[in-house]
Amino acid sequence: MFKQALELIKKYDTIIIHRHTNPDGDAIGSQVGMKELIKTNFPQKTVYIVGDDAKRFSFMEDCSPDNIPNNVYDNALAIILDTSVRSMISDGRYTLAKETLRFDHHIKCEDIADVDIIDTSYESCCGLITDFALQTGLKLNVLAAKSLFTGMVTDSGRFRYDSVNARTFRLAAALKEYGFDTNKLYANLYADDFEIIKLRAIYTLKIKFTKNNVAYIITTKDELAAVKADEFTVSRGMVGVMSEIKGVDTWVNFTETESGVLCELRSKRYNVNPVAAKYGGGGHAKASGATIKDLETAMDMLKDLDELKE
């Protein structure tokens, strides 16, 4: 699996790395980590990263996207990271590349790249890339290791999710050997502004429940406009306020925006991915997302979640 990816990387002098829009720690970590991995082992290659702003994760080193013209894609390899559907890829110009390569740990929803390295047994795309480096004998540098470790930490819920296994800790340990400061990293990841803490309190009071105890939050466009946070902070950031409620196995956050309703689906017990896929989304068995057209459709999704069985 990894050999084919390495040969494709060796083949091209210009490589452009994409990831999903509204990036999380795994998307940014895998993008920066892959760039540093390639530059460390093949210094003669030109490597770019592209996409929308890193937002919450802008503290990560060298994560600012490069501004490149279309002709850079001529005879270039585009690497797509941490993305299962085309609609989520930030910067659609990957289609201009000579060839495409994807690394992902989500359930496959679409054929996107010429070569796919997809394995859902990894807790993160960063974990997959770390194993790729170790198994192919590629060298890491400190920035690559720190970036990849960041993605592993965030996508595993600080190593608490079901996706974590013994391999996760072996890979994390290999990265930690590079000696970066984890205390500083955790402070950047988990110390919040007081406004975010107040926002969590507000959203905790918005929680409602279905007859089968699915927890859910609905934010209308007007409510979103009234809070001091962007749509990603509300959608992805507030879904976690429902995660530690006793007796709640499944929860969902609906955030209405100008372009549709952002849906974040989570469960401790059930596979929510088929529900997300039904509405054009995807992700993992117990953490998926989708964007749907309106709140009426959101109620249909909520009904489907309420009827989940093992």
Residues covered by each model-derived region:
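Short, motif-level signal for alpha-helix interfacial/capping segments enriched in acidic residues
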Residues: 1-4, 81-82, 133-135
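Hydrophobic helix-and-loop "lid/oligomerization" segment in the mid-to-C-terminal part
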Residues: 2-21, 29-58, 70, 74-75, ...
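Fold-independent oxyanion-binding glycine-rich loops
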Residues: 20, 52-53, 81-84, 103-106, ...
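Short glycine/serine/threonine-rich phosphate/pyrophosphate-binding segments
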Residues: 25-31, 87-89
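Conserved beta-strand segments of alpha/beta enzyme cores
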Residues: 46-48, 99, 116, 139
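Structural signal for conserved beta-strand scaffold positions within catalytic alpha/beta enzyme cores
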Residues: 49, 80, 102, 117-119, ...
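Active-site cofactor/cluster-binding pocket
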Residues: 61-115
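Short alpha-helices
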Residues: 106-171
